[in-house]
């Protein structure tokens, strides 16, 4: 990305702006490959953060509590995990060469509540394995893949669009898992971000650790 600047700044303020623009231009990526690699790194970072957040929320509830539904018709943690596992597998298996909605996927079954708590152990094992499919793909993708076409339900997307779509999708479901854990644990919930009333202390600690 380059910024257009005046060749002859009119005053001191313009000179300052021009200098800052020049510095930014020198520091910014100079080609699309660098931008693409930065995007892929950002995607991996975001997905890893979402998984970590979900893991920390799920660690605070028991297998029995995975089946808790806060209201009739709402999804339990088990159903949300079940759905995300199915989505991860379908979207990112053979990502570049097959439709992201696999014919073998049974999406409606992902929203069926598990019959017993005994099924939670298998679901807990499937969860990290499904995420690994995504992380392995991100390790393989390169900047020049981002504009390649892929299909989801027969609709064409670029790789960039398809991955960004899942960033938003998983963020919403991870938020649901965190909220469920907060409802279940109540006052005993261990905060996964800056605790209430602790913003100033957190900011001070960040400043001191720079």
Language-model features: locations:
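N-terminal amphipathic/basic-hydrophobic helices that include classical n-h-c signal peptides
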Residues: 1-25
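A structural signal for long alpha-helical coiled-coils and helix-turn connectors
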Residues: 58, 62, 138-142, 181
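Short, contiguous alpha-helical
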Residues: 13, 28-30, 44-48, 52-55, ...
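Hydrophobic alpha-helical core bundles mediating ligand binding, dimerization, or RNAP-core interactions
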Residues: 43, 47, 51, 58, ...
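Short, charged, low-complexity loops and linkers
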Residues: 29-44, 112-116
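Acidic/histidine-rich alpha-helical segments that form the ligand environment
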Residues: 112-150, 157-171, 176
